[in-house]
Each structure stands twice: as structure tokens, then as C-alpha cells.
Amino acid sequence: MGLSWTVPLEWGKNHSTTNPLGFFPDHQLDPAFRANTRNPDWDHNPNKDHWTEANKVGVGAFGPGFTPPHGGLLGWSPQAQGMLKTLPADPPPASTNRQSGRQPTPITPPLRDTHPQAMQWNSTTFHQALQDPRVRGLYFPAGGSSSGTVNPVPTTVSLISSIFSRTGDPAPNMEGITSGFLGPLLVLQAGFFLLTKILTIPQSLDSWWTSLNFLGGAPVCLGQNSQSPTSNHSPTSCPPICPGYRWMCLRRFIIFLFILLLCLIFLLVLLGYQGMLPVCPLIPGSSTTITGPCRTCTTLAQGTSMFPSCCCSKPSDGNCTCIPIPSSWAFGKFLWEWASARFSWLSLLVPFVQWFAGLSPTVWLSVIWMMWYWGPSLYNILSPFIPLLPIFFCLWVYI
């Protein structure tokens, strides 16, 4: 049974759609070649539609090997046409246009073409330029010395080495310069640290002083009244409008005087240890001592090479007697004699001191135990004076 059918004329009127029938891939309905007539000149049409997708083999609604490009007889839906297997399109050919991508780095032209002025400099012209004082100042500063003439050399390497090989002042020792700056900086930092700690001594002692008036309670300023009402604050930080401000200043002034007295005592002890104070102890067998500047001793004392000796004058043929004694003991005796001359009641304490010095070891152990028991409290009291210890140590070593 054969199938015969003709193409309706209405299909040929659709000039905007190429190949409307779907099975003439190499022909096009063109009005110029009688496309709307019954006998179109298909073969003589030069504008053929080369539809490569129509020649591809696929599975569609019309069976294997034929895929209508504009829908099958059952419609446009995928269900009507069956399973469509989309084949990927061929990738475009690789472009041979090098202008579209990164351009290769061009070959560097020779130096004679890019910098012709550089080719004018050779060893002779360079040495001639070095004779100019302005140019020589760049290579030979005023601090160094060099020869008056520069001998030409054949190679550039030896030329540069001859320019920078100076015979003059040596290079500065950077290690010595660094250590010279580092020492004062460390001393300045340590001094600033000690100063900040020393400035806290008056406030700490002021807090301890005021705490004696508030045993078992928090210190509160008692200078508040109705005339100058202030908020609750510590007596060690009274504002100027508080009546307790003047008492706070008085306490700190007394504390500063106490610190200065302590430093003065330490200085006197240090001078006495160095043998710079004309203090002489009582010579055994004599009741009087002549104080004055030490004179040259005719007889050297035993064991006085490391420690100073006190030289006391005696009217014995104009010679002086040197006695090796602890300088601290001499200084203590000097202070005791000075205080006893002005305060006669201190002489009453001499028997007590002698008795205390002759106590048994049991009493000394008891004293040590009490110091151990009261040690933490004593540390809290003496802790503000700890920053003074490095200063005292430095003075003791370097004076």
C-alpha cells in the first residue's frame, strides 16, 4: 500500500522559516526561483540552506534515523516526539588570531639602540669625569683620603672595585656605637622605674599611718563637714576642698623628711666604711680620744689591706696609732656620743644595752622566733623601702 501526498501551497508562503518540511536540508524556498509555484526550481537555487543538524541521526517520533527539525506530526511536545537525544554541537575551530590573547614578550633590543648615550661612556671618559670635584665628592667624601689620580683599568669590574676601595679612615665600629647608646638607655629606664616606685613610698607609708587610727575597719576621711561636703574617700587621697587635705600634706611631708634622714644615715655609714670620716674609737688603756683628720701611720695595722683603719692621734713622739676596727662600729659610736652629748638621758640606756648584749642564746632564739612570727607584718611595713635597696647598693659599690 503506497502513500502519496502533495505539499500544500500555504507551506511555501512562510518565507521566514527555513526548510519548513524538514526533509530537504540542501534546499530553500526562495520566491526568486518560483518557490511558490508547483514546479520550483530547487536545483538551480544558489542560496541553499546547509543545515548540518538535519543530517544527524537521532531517535524521534518518525522512527530511527530521522529527526524533523520543526516538530513531528504529533506536535511540538517532547512526549509527542518521543525521547530526544541532544547531541553536543561541534566546538568552534581554534582561532589562529594571536591578537586575541596575551601577546608574547618582545625581544629586548640591544643597548646601543635603546640607550645610545650609554655607549659613549668607556673607561677613559669615566676617569675623565672623575676628575670633576663634584663627581669625586660622590665617591670620595671629605672624611676619607684617596690618591690624586685614578689609573685607567681595562675592565668594568676592576674599575668599580678601584672606585670603592678607599684608603682612609676606617669604617666606624657599629658594635661600639650600639653599646654606647644601649648603656645610657638601660640606666635611664632603670632610673625611671625606681623613681616611679620611690614615689609610691609616701603614699604607702601614709596608708599605713592612717590605718593605725582605724584598727579593724576601713579608713574613712574624718574631715567631712557641712561647710564643705565631699563624697566618701580615703584619708590618703583627700581633695583640696576637704579639711583633711592639709593633714594629708603634713603626713607626707613628715614621711619625706624621714626618707631623707634614712638616706643621710646610709650615706654617713658608707663614708664611715670607706674611711672618709674622722671618727676614732677609744684606744685601749686611754680615756680620751682626739678626733681630727687621719694622719700617716708609722705602724701598719694587722689585716687592714681590705678594710679601712681609723688613725687616732696620740702625743707619743708625734706618731699616730692605727687600729683596724669596723667602720660601722666607729660610726655608731660617733652617733652615740653625739646624741649623748645633747640628750643626757640616753646614758641611762647603756646598762640595758650591755645587759641585752650579754643575753644567753635562748633569748636570742626567742627573738628570732618572734621575728619569724611577725615577719609578714614587718614585710608589709618595710616593702615600700625595697626600691631604695638598689640605690643603696649602687652607692655602696661605686663610692
From Swiss-Prot:
Biotechnology: Systematic vaccination of individuals at risk of exposure to the virus has been the main method of controlling the morbidity and mortality associated with hepatitis B. The first hepatitis B vaccine was manufactured by the purification and inactivation of HBsAg obtained from the plasma of chronic hepatitis B virus carriers. The vaccine is now produced by recombinant DNA techniques and expression of the S isoform in yeast cells. The pre-S region do not seem to induce strong enough antigenic response.
Lipidated sites in chain (N-myristoyl glycine): G2
Encoding gene per record: S
Domain of life of the source: Viruses
GO cellular component terms, A-Z: membrane; viral envelope; virion membrane
Pfam family, one: vMSA
Organism name: Hepatitis B virus genotype E (isolate Cote d'Ivoire/ABI-212/2003)
Annotated localization: Virion membrane
Annotated spans, Pre-S2: 119-173
Region: Disordered, residue numbers: 84-109
Glycan attachment positions: N319
Protein name as it appears in the record: Large envelope protein
Ranges where the record places region Pre-S1: 2-118
Cytoplasm recorded as keyword: no
Gene Ontology BP terms: caveolin-mediated endocytosis of virus by host cell; fusion of virus membrane with host endosome membrane; virion attachment to host cell
Key words, A-Z: Acetylation, Caveolin-mediated endocytosis of virus by host, Fusion of virus membrane with host endosomal membrane, Fusion of virus membrane with host membrane, Glycoprotein, Host-virus interaction, Lipoprotein, Membrane, Myristate, Transmembrane, Transmembrane helix, Viral attachment to host cell, Viral envelope protein, Viral penetration into host cytoplasm, Virion, Virus endocytosis by host, Virus entry into host cell
Chain ranges passing through the membrane: 181-201, 253-273, 348-368, 375-397
Comp. bias regions, Polar residues: 95-105
